[in-house]
Amino acid sequence: MLKYILLFIRKGKLMKNNHNLLMKMKNLEKFSGAIKRCVAIAMASMLFATTGFSLDTHPVKAQEVSSSADKIEIPEISKDAFKKYKKISGIGANTILGADFTYYQQCLEWGKSYKNYMSQSVDNIFDYVKSQGINTISLKVAVNPTGENAYLSLENAIKTLKAVKASNTNLKTNLVLLYSDEITYAGTQNLPADWEKAEKEEQSVTRVESAKTYTRETIAKLKQAKVLPDIVTIGNEVNWNFLGITDGEGWEGWKAMGDISALLKKEGVKNAVSIAAQPDAASVKYIVQKLGYASVDYDYIGVNVYPDNNTNSYIKSLKNEVESCAPDKQLIVSNVEYERVNEANTANVYTQADSIYNLLEATIDEKNAGGLIYNEAAYVGSWKSFFDDEGDAQVSMAIFAYAQGMRQIQAEILINTEMILV
């Protein structure tokens, strides 16, 4: 049986001194099969040597094939690497398979484009990521972001939510309200500048009142735009001093979360809270206890993780703790990312995919639908995203489909002017 070697050649990306070699390779069709195979192999070897291409380190890009519920496109060389991934036991419609698209509008403003694994432009990015197993689009929103934080604007989020809705993909949406003018993290929970000013004025408005007013106004704008999300996440890593009044024995911040969750529930929106991982997984019961005392009506408890060698075992322990103290809540990983490129050359799309699969599996069992939201998934050019600096999708994204048992039935490799068949 003839074996096919597919080499993807992107126009304008090869060194000029390979131009003649490429032209000769494209003219091979005039020769007989045996001669063509021998000559092509020799030429391909020369091409690899002069361009630095390597089948060992670079995924080969194959022509896109049609997708369906149980068929996804995977570049030919990636098939063997992905064969080991089975459908995760317990995964289902309620599992959150999320991609953070906060940077999406910013990337469009920068002139970036989104392509499939074969460098072909996709008609609809949301239809495309759904075909790769994603079921939730997540967006972070700041109160009054400016400068380098402008990408966090509500206006950008509404544009993206409208695009998701127009795609008719039935993707779920999650909006993370940061209650700050910038990204918030564990030790960085800066109050919006206007709220801080209002609190200091003679007729002071408390930060809690400002937060509730902001929530009402945001929901009103979303409803007016007809893009009310399925889920709203209240803050980010809120166990670390939400609104600056939650740390230690602070109580008002927790109570504010309860009031905000009540506002959201009236609108029929599911609630999530995002926490920073505690050193001891058992400590989550104290967070759940405080949420209960403050009457926070939430559906999901998300934990942000910064992966290390113990992350998966930690998440399994955390899942057991949540199932014990809050059995009606769904634990998810609300923020995570893995390198696919690094300076040490120890990361690639396959290590990235493997890390995602193992973490996702750790969140799921018969009691917890689990899931994760992949941070900055749509940030074109990031070493941790699903799109490289040219906008090409990375095969690691398909791990979400494999985790659901959506396997490619048959590879259909076609020849066009940008491909060489050996």
Where are these predicted regions, by residue range?
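Bacterial Sec-dependent N-terminal signal peptides
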Residues: 2-42
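Sec-dependent signal peptide cleavage junction
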Residues: 48-68
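N-terminal carbohydrate-binding accessory modules
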Residues: 68-132
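Hydrophobic faces of well-ordered beta-strands that scaffold small-molecule active sites
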Residues: 97-101, 137-139, 173-177, 232-234, ...
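Active-site beta-loop-alpha junctions enriched in small/polar residues
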Residues: 102-104, 142-144, 176-180, 234-239, ...
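Aromatic-lined substrate-binding rim segments of carbohydrate-active enzymes
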Residues: 121-184, 249-270, 315, 319
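Active-site cleft segment of glycoside hydrolase catalytic domains centered on the general acid/base Glu
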Residues: 154-155, 185-291, 296-298, 309-320, ...
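Aromatic-rich peripheral "rim/lid" segments of glycoside hydrolase catalytic domains that contact
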Residues: 343-355, 362, 366-422
